[in-house]
From Swiss-Prot:
InterPro entries: LacY/RafB_perm_fam, LacY/RafB_perm_fam_CS, MFS_dom, MFS_trans_sf. It holds the Pfam family LacY_symp. The record marks E131, R149 as: Substrate binding. SUPFAM superfamilies: MFS general substrate transporter. Keywords: Cell inner membrane, Cell membrane, Membrane, Sugar transport, Symport, Transmembrane, Transmembrane helix, Transport. It comes from the Bacteria. This is Lactose permease. It is a multi-pass membrane protein. The record marks R307, H327, E330 as: Proton translocation. It comes from Klebsiella oxytoca.
Length: 416
């Protein structure tokens, strides 16, 4: 529905939650892309220790993700979860500067566990809860979720360049900016009125909201061969790629005259890539509708394999910049392809549980195991040799997935 056709309250909610997405993903971008750089340069962690931190974050994401999904479904349009995450984000700078960093330098395991709890709650688990809540608000207030979500891409892209510049001056500046923007999130939550209309409540009562996780549907999935075929792809391709990307920033900045210059360029490339990602995301549903979800996942796997293997042979800054930009082509095919594959290859009632177990939890569980091992490999054989091994793994599993993923001759609507 057009913005002009919305009621005043609905129009206000559209604006409030568009801004909420912008500032939330701005804050997330202050953490995620440059986190391995912060661990290495500020806290002097080895690549093995960095892998341990990532493993802990994934571990606590596994613990909290299902819990927050259930709580989110129970709360509906009430703002309790968003208030909790906003308060925790206000503490972003104090936590990183006065708690997380000293703990990491004093005891790596204590720091990894405490940081894993905080980051696993605020970002790895809660980002899904934020997305689900605002999607629910969009249905209750008759505006399109996708139009609101684009502002998150813009916030992420803008912060990447700012952080790349400020990191060379003082990383703490970015953390304080993030905490300040979290205060704005609080104001936006305070003024928003996301209560649904009567008709929306009826739709909600009829089960239009996403199905909650249940052990019965999980057990039904485990008996399906096509479920395990999908798991093979997620664990062998998508999960390995995520672990590869965790410390790519440290590899990237090594190709420049100084680490500071490398960090700045990494920020600019991330910004350009994120804007390109948003553009491709608009086109991806129509493309995937034409080629099919299985082929979309295979193309994503091929792009991931090319990027990892290409990185193992990269010798110049230009090459790593081009390889970094490939990430923005892979993401739309992976995300949209996953949703379309789930909807075409499985029963509708299984889709939510399948996405939770088959995609999110399996990726996080794989990351718990792989992150520390890959970090250790970086320290022992170096980035190039490790990337060659990881690239061969993803390429092999992409080929295997050609036979284990289920194809579908039925084309889906061109909406993600």
């Amino acid at each position: 529905m057009k913005l002009s056709e919305l009621a005043p309250r609905e129009r206000h909610n559209f604006i409030y939650f568009m801004l909420f997405f912008f500032f939330y993903y701005f804050i997330m971008s202050a953490y995620f892309p440059f986190f391995p750089v912060w661990l290495a340069e500020v806290n002097h962690l080895t690549k093995t220790e960095t892998g341990i931190v990532f493993s802990c974050i994934s571990l606590f994401a596994i613990i909290f993700q299902p819990v927050f999904g259930l709580i989110s479904d129970k709360l509906g349009l009430r703002k309790h979860l968003l208030w909790t995450i906003t308060i925790l984000l206000i503490l972003f700078a104090p936590f990183f500067i006065f708690v997380f960093s000293p703990l990491l330098q004093m005891n790596i395991m204590a720091g990894a566990l405490v940081g894993g709890v905080y980051l696993g709650i605020v970002f790895s688990s809660r980002s899904g809860a934020v997305e689900a809540y605002i999607e629910r608000v969009s249905r209750a207030n008759r505006f399109e979720y996708g139009k609101v979500r684009v502002s998150g891409c813009v916030g992420w892209a803008l912060c990447a360049s700012i952080t790349g510049i400020l990191f060379s001056i003082d990383p703490n500046i970015t953390f304080w900016i993030a905490s300040g923007f979290a205060l704005i999130l609080g104001v936006l939550l305070w003024v928003s009125k996301p209560e649904s209309s009567n008709s929306a409540e009826v739709i909600d009562a009829l089960g239009a909201n996403r199905q909650a996780f249940s052990m019965r549907t999980a057990a039904e999935l485990f008996r399906m061969p096509r479920f395990w075929g999908f798991i093979i792809y997620v664990v062998g391709v998508a999960s390995v790629y995520d672990v590869f990307d965790q410390q790519f920033a440290n590899f990237f900045k090594g190709f420049f005259s100084s680490p500071q210059r490398g960090t700045e360029v990494f920020g600019f490339v991330t910004t350009g890539g994120e804007l390109l990602n948003a553009l491709i995301m608009f086109c991806a549903p129509a493309i995937i509708n034409r080629i099919g979800a299985k082929n979309a996942l295979l193309i994503a796997g091929l792009i991931m394999s090319v990027r990892i293997l290409g990185s193992s042979f990269a010798t110049s800054a230009v090459e790593v910049i081009i390889l970094k930009m490939l990430h923005m082509f892979e993401i739309p095919f992976l995300l949209v392809g996953t949703f379309k594959y789930i909807s075409s290859a499985f029963k509708g009632k299984l889709s939510a549980t399948l996405f939770l177990i088959g995609f999110n939890l399996s990726k996080q569980l794989s990351s718990v195991v792989l992150s520390a091992w890959v970090g250790r490999m970086y320290d022992t054989v170096g980035f190039h040799q490790a990337y060659l091994i990881l690239g061969c793994i993803t390429l092999s599993f992409t080929v295997i997935s050609l036979f284990t993923l289920k194809g579908s001759k039925t084309l889906l609507p061109a909406t993600a």
